[in-house]
From Swiss-Prot:
The modification N6-acetyllysine is found at K74. This is Porphobilinogen deaminase. The gene is HMBS. Monomer. Binds 1 dipyrromethane group covalently. Keywords: Acetylation, Cytoplasm, Heme biosynthesis, Phosphoprotein, Porphyrin biosynthesis, Transferase. Its EC number is 2.5.1.61. It comes from Bos taurus (Bovine). The modification Phosphoserine is found at S69, S147.
Length: 361
């Protein structure tokens, strides 16, 4: 059985006792809000199913005194959740897509890429600097960010500022900003602030010419067991075609560059007039060196889902059998082409030096 037939079968089975779908999530407030939103959508689609949310801490949640890029481990926010999937303790896991590596461990796949919210970064200012911008902050002001990508781009753009690592969940980082006198501002993902209902704290949105965003930023990904056809069918309806195609291009670019948390890589994508545009860049740690370019490809964004073959291999960790294959392959090839272009221009040297310097500090 293909398509939503399996999902319908799940919804009908076990009556009168309803089948319970167990959903894994990180414990942070933002992770819970994100998971609740996905579960609410699934409940509306499948009123015959019950959902149980199981929250757990991950390595990235526990190690709070070290910059993410220094911990030296991929899957910082996903490993414990994947163990639960593997042991059949949960049926699906909701993540921020940017936390999911472009190569997933064997046996797992991203079964849904949900509609993207704002992918841009935002600046939140200390109360005494409200009304300022990064440009107008005093000389030597300290700006907190946990991301090499943000720090590299912003040091290049705003050399009068100093950038320092700040860790913790959103609540913790905002508290550190407001209560300590250490930071004049911090950089956070706009989507996270919006989901928490903290739009009023956004003092400045950073547009691509100031700071391109992380691969997958603003989108949620639903990770499942790769061979669990029932659950794949269940969550597949959550795929947002435009978000999916943009994120396949972004993840393909990152994967082909062999980038990750330990190097500054950023992107910007857009679909306009039947064209998918991908801008990607790499930076040295201090932002002094950079290499960027833009490419485009013709793409057809499907209006509705359709059933596809069950044996199609994953693309950059994503399974989307209900979205036509051709545009997915076009998006993947665009990412590969742009990465190849930058590598041929010498991007590997910038990334290698950034990686070595990051590991040495």
């Amino acid at each position: 059985m293909s398509g939503n037939g399996n999902a319908a079968a799940i919804a009908e089975e076990d009556t009168p006792k309803m089948r319970v779908i167990r959903v894994g999530t990180r414990k942070s407030q933002l992770a819970r809000i994100q998971t609740d939103s996905v579960v609410a959508t699934l409940k509306a689609l499948y009123p015959g199913l019950q959902f149980e949310i199981i929250a757990m801490s991950t390595t990235g949640d526990k190690i709070l005194d070290t910059a993410l890029s220094k911990i030296g481990e991929k899957s910082l926010f996903t490993k414990e959740l994947e163990h639960a999937l593997e042991r059949n303790e949960v049926d699906l896991v909701v993540h921020s897509l940017k936390d999911l590596p472009t190569v997933l461990p064997p046996g797992f796949t991203i079964g849904a890429v949900c509609k993207r919210e704002s992918p841009y970064d935002a600046v939140v200012f200390h109360p005494k600097f409200v009304g300022k911008t990064l440009e107008t902050l005093p000389e030597k002001s300290v700006v907190g960010t946990s991301s090499l990508r943000r720090a590299a781009q912003l040091q290049r753009k705003f050399p009068h500022l100093e950038f320092k690592s700040i860790r913790g969940n959103l609540n913790t980082r905002l508290r550190k900003l407001d209560e300590l006198q250490e930071f004049s501002a911090i950089i956070l993902a706009t989507a996270g602030l919006q989901r928490m209902g903290w739009q009023n704290r956004v003092g400045q949105i950073l547009h691509p010419e100031e700071c391109m965003y992380a691969v997958g930023q603003g989108a949620l990904g639903v990770e499942v067991r790769a061979k669990d056809q029932d659950i794949l069918d269940l969550v597949g309806v959550l795929h947002d075609p435009e978000t999916l195609l943009r994120c396949i291009a972004e993840r393909s670019f990152l994967r082909h560059l062999e980038g990750g948390c330990s190097v500054p890589v950023a992107v910007h994508t857009a679909i306009k007039d039947g064209q998918l545009y991908l801008t990607g860049g790499v930076w040295s740690l201090n932002g002094a060196e950079t290499m960027q370019d833009t490419m485009q490809t013709t793409i057809h964004v499907p209006v509705q889902h359709e059933d596809g073959p069950e044996d199609d291999p994953q693309l950059v960790g994503i399974t989307a059998r209900n979205i036509p294959r051709q545009p997915q392959l076009a998006a993947e090839n665009l990412g590969i082409s742009l990465a190849t272009l930058l590598l041929n221009k010498g991007a590997k040297n910038i990334l290698d030096v950034a990686r070595q310097l990051n590991e040495a500090h």
